């Protein structure tokens, strides 16, 4: 996907707010499954549309659910092409939810 978007690894992990070491772990350790929130960071960093996100999540063992508040909020951002992770985190916090962090993955 990075090649399709003419994006370097460094550009991607910075845009997605993913630590370089964590990104390397995702890339090189095939048995490692990143957290759901990290996958959402990846979706926002890749600027996926809603269908692409729905197709991408199962590749990493997740699915989009309208029963999960975080999914609804991230889905809103994706649907409306708002790829600002900081703004998404602010909205999540305002709703009493955890921001999309990945440092402890």
Region annotations inferred by a language model:
Residues 6-25:
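Short alpha-helical DNA-recognition segment
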Residues 1, 15, 26, 56:
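Residues in the recognition helix of alpha-helical DNA-binding motifs
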Residues 1-8, 86-105:
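A short, Lys/Arg-rich alpha-helix, primarily the initiator
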Residues 54-82, 103:
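Short, charged recognition helix plus adjacent turn
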Residues 19, 30, 60-63:
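The DNA-recognition helices of helix-turn-helix-type DNA-binding domains
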Residues 2, 13, 43:
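The alpha-helix within a helix-turn-helix
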Residues 30-44:
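Short, basic-rich loop-to-helix N-cap that marks the start of a DNA-contacting helix
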Residues 8, 19, 35, 47-52, ...:
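Helix N-cap / loop-to-helix initiation motif
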């Amino acid at each position: 996907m990075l090649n399709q978007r003419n994006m370097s690894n460094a550009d991607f992990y910075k845009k997605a707010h993913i630590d370089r070491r964590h990104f390397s772990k995702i890339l090189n350790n095939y048995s490692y499954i990143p957290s759901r929130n990290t996958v959402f960071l990846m979706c926002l960093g890749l600027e996926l549309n809603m269908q692409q996100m729905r197709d991408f999540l199962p590749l990493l063992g997740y699915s989009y659910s309208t029963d999960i508040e975080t999914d609804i909020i991230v889905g809103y951002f994706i649907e409306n092409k708002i790829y600002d992770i900081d703004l998404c985190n602010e909205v999540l916090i305002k709703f009493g939810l955890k921001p999309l962090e990945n440092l402890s993955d």
